[in-house]
């Protein structure tokens, strides 16, 4: 991977209804309903709003068999009104629900942390190598019949790992670590490869964007080692609403998109689902502007570790560098020096002259040839 020059990671193509994912396809945008899945009419209407806003997949929670079976009615309701957007069933805890959902949805999301392994009790478990291998066989015994149902119905799957729902088995062996999240996913991917099931999308999510970014990067590295190129679904869990939710999603998803990673994204907001689509669209459109940019002859520092980056050591100058937090510099060359009280910059760059009326809590930067050392809280910019 070239960290200075953008190029999208090559991934395999996955068929999801009439909207394929990965390969040479565009980065897809999706959302998730927050309606009761047994309420067919409400689900259909909300799905339509998501689709009309630009959503290319619609995910619905399927807590039980009844909800999974009702996906058939929701699908019929949408198709009868001219919508052919694929539906995705979101399944937790019960493999039987996934078996049913695979017959009516174009894609089924399962969580490795609770698909076969029992619910978390936060106990430390000890395994011999043989016992650990037996636990993997239990996963195979339950997962392969599900894959066969998916093959029969041309249903894709997403193996979706969540930071907060790793099994006791994985937690005991790896701890609450990115490595544990990656291995939780890889266990299922190896079974898919062995069974020649290729319509697989993967995701690893966390509410902590630093953990999310590091773990997805690590997952891609591990897949490359084993010759896998499954497409990636990106998202930040519990991002929130308003500006905070949008900023948090942009940080996590945007950092990975900038790496060239990601084939579909969902911006998760605590708002109406259709509000997520424009935010996702902006992220994708921004990253597309980087395609074909002029070559940047950058070179990584010898000590830089892409999978576990650390802050470069610097000398502190005033409140910049060293152990200080990064500062925010605003540019005000057009002469407007008003600031939002909630979002004040640390410094304002004002070009060749400083304003007569200044905020004492903000430092000012001026061009070096216009700097007067007698001016308080004003510093030269060379």
Where are the regions that the model predicts?
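N-terminal amphipathic alpha-helix/helix-capping segment at the start of soluble metabolic enzymes
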Residues: 1-31, 147-153, 289-337, 376
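Active-site mouth loops of central-metabolism enzymes
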Residues: 7, 23-42, 61-63, 85-94, ...
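Hydrophobic faces of well-ordered beta-strands that scaffold small-molecule active sites
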Residues: 27-33, 56-60, 85-91, 108-110, ...
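Glycine-rich, proline-tolerant flexible connector loops at the mouths of alpha/beta enzymes
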Residues: 34, 54-78, 112-134, 200-209, ...
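N-terminal active-site wall of soluble small-molecule enzyme domains
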Residues: 62-104, 335-338, 357, 374
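Alpha-helix-loop-beta-strand connector modules within alpha/beta enzyme cores
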Residues: 65-89, 138-154, 219-228, 289, ...
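Hydrophobic or amphipathic alpha-helical targeting/insertion segments
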Residues: 84-123, 129-149, 154
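Catalytic alpha/beta core domains of metabolic enzymes, predominantly
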Residues: 126-143, 148, 170-321
